[in-house]
């Protein structure tokens, strides 16, 4: 259970960082 929870937590962090970087690049390109 702990391994699955930590895995999903890590996956959530990666998705959040990727989304933040993608949005940042999009804003830079729009400006």
Swiss-Prot record:
Keywords of the record: Chloroplast, Electron transport, Membrane, Photosynthesis, Plastid, Thylakoid, Transmembrane, Transmembrane helix, Transport
Major location category of this protein: plastid
UniProt keyword DNA-binding, yes or no: no
Cellular localisation: Plastid, Chloroplast thylakoid membrane
Membrane-spanning segments: 4-24
Domain of life: Eukaryota
GO annotation terms (biological process): photosynthesis
GO cellular component: chloroplast thylakoid membrane; cytochrome b6f complex
InterPro entries: Cyt_b6/f_cplx_su6
GO molecular function, one term: electron transporter, transferring electrons within cytochrome b6/f complex of photosystem II activity
Any Pfam family hit: PetL
Membrane topology: Single-pass membrane protein
Family: Belongs to the PetL family.
Subunit architecture: The 4 large subunits of the cytochrome b6-f complex are cytochrome b6, subunit IV (17 kDa polypeptide, PetD), cytochrome f and the Rieske protein, while the 4 small subunits are PetG, PetL, PetM and PetN. The complex functions as a dimer.
Protein name: Cytochrome b6-f complex subunit 6
Record organism: Jasminum nudiflorum
